[in-house]
Amino acid sequence: MSHPEAPITPEVEADLAIARRGCDELLVESEFARKLARSRATGVPLRIKLGLDPTAPDIHLGHTVVLNKMRQLQDLGHNVIFLIGDFTSTIGDPSGRNSTRPPLTREQIETNAKTYYAQASLVLDPARTEIRYNSEWCDPLGARGMIQLASRYTVARMMEREDFTRRFKGGVPIAVHEFLYPLLQGYDSVALKADLELGGTDQKFNLLVGRELQKEYGQEQQCILTMPLLVGTDGVEKMSKSKGNYIGISEAPESMFGKLMSISDMLMWRYYELLSFRSLADIAALKAEIDGGRNPRDAKVALAQEIVARFHSPQAAEAALAAFEARFRDGAIPEDMPEVTVGGAPQGILRILREAGLVASGSEAQRNVEQGGVRVNGDRVEDKSLQLSAGTYVVQVGKRKFARVKLVG
C-alpha cells in the first residue's frame, strides 16, 4: 500500500529521538521516520500497539519500561492501543521458555485483567488510550479461520525462533499449539492495523511475525520497537516477582522508596534512562554534577521521589523521603560501608550476618538477633529464622557494624 512521501523535518527527527531513547532496537528505523513524517504532514496520528497477557495480577517497574515508551509516544499525539491478550493467555506465550507454559483459565485471566489496566493507567493517559481484547477477533476465527491463518506461515520460519530450536535440539517437546501463539499475536496487528508495535527484547520474533502477516494481508507493515528488560534491585537478574528483586507499582510508598535507594549507583543511571520522565539533557547534567563530586545519593533520592510521586503522589514521596531519612538518622547509618555479595537467595539472616563478616559465628549471630541488635534497612530483626529474598540490603549489627549486602540467587 503506497503513501505519499513527506519530508523528514527537524520536528520528525526530534520525535524519532524520543522513540529511540533507551530502546534496544527500532526496526525498520527509516520506515518509522517516514511514518512519523507522514503523520505530521497529514495530522493523522499513528496507531501504536502494546499487547500484554494478564498472566499475573500485579505490574512491577519492569513492566513500566515499555509503558513509559508508550506514554512518550502518546504525548506526541499518537493513538496508543493497550491490548489485553485474554485469548492468547489461554495458549501461553512460549517466548524464552525451556518447556511448555501452562495456559491460564478464563477465570484467572479475567481476575488478572481487572487490575492490569487500572495499574497501567498510572503511566498511560486513560483519556487517550484505546483498550482492546484480542478475543474480539480471535474467538470468531474458528477452526477454518485458524487453519487459514496457519497457512500464512511456514514451520521453517517458526523454527528460526531460538527457544524453539533449543528445545527441538534438546529433545524437549514443543506442542503444536505453541506455534499458534506468535501467529495470533501477529494477527492482532492485522486486526488493529498497527503502525508500530512495542515489546520487550524477548518479544522480537513475535513482533516480526506481525510485520510478515500484515504484508500477507496487504497492509502496510508495522515497525517494531523493543525495549530492554529492566534489571532488578539485585543488579544481576531481570526484574521478576519470582526472583524477589522487583518493585511493585502498587507497593507502599516507603517500601518503594527504600528499594529504589538500595540499588547500586551504576544501576541508578540505567533506571534513570528507562524509568524517569526527565529529559536526557537533564539526566546528563545531573550525571556531570555527580562526576564532579556531588553525592550520588542526591541523584538516587531524586529518582526515588519521582517514581513514588508518579505511582502515589508528591506528598507520599515527601513523606517516604522523611521516613527514610529519619530511619537512617536515628540509626546513624553511614553512607560509605563495605559491600558484600552473598549467594543462595533466599537466605537466612544468621548466615547472611556470618557471610558479611558482621559476626564471627552462628551463635554470635543468634545472640545479636535475640538481643535486638540486628537491623535490615533500618528495621529491627526480631525473628532469627528471617529469610531474605534476592536484593540489596543495609545490614547493621550493634551501633557500629554495617554492610551493604547484595543477595543473589
Curated annotation (Swiss-Prot):
Keywords: Aminoacyl-tRNA synthetase, ATP-binding, Cytoplasm, Ligase, Nucleotide-binding, Protein biosynthesis, RNA-binding. It is an enzyme of class 6 (ligase). Its EC number is 6.1.1.1. HAMAP family: Tyr_tRNA_synth_type2. Belongs to the class-I aminoacyl-tRNA synthetase family. TyrS type 2 subfamily. NCBIfam families: tyrS. This is Tyrosine--tRNA ligase. It comes from Bordetella parapertussis (strain 12822 / ATCC BAA-587 / NCTC 13253).
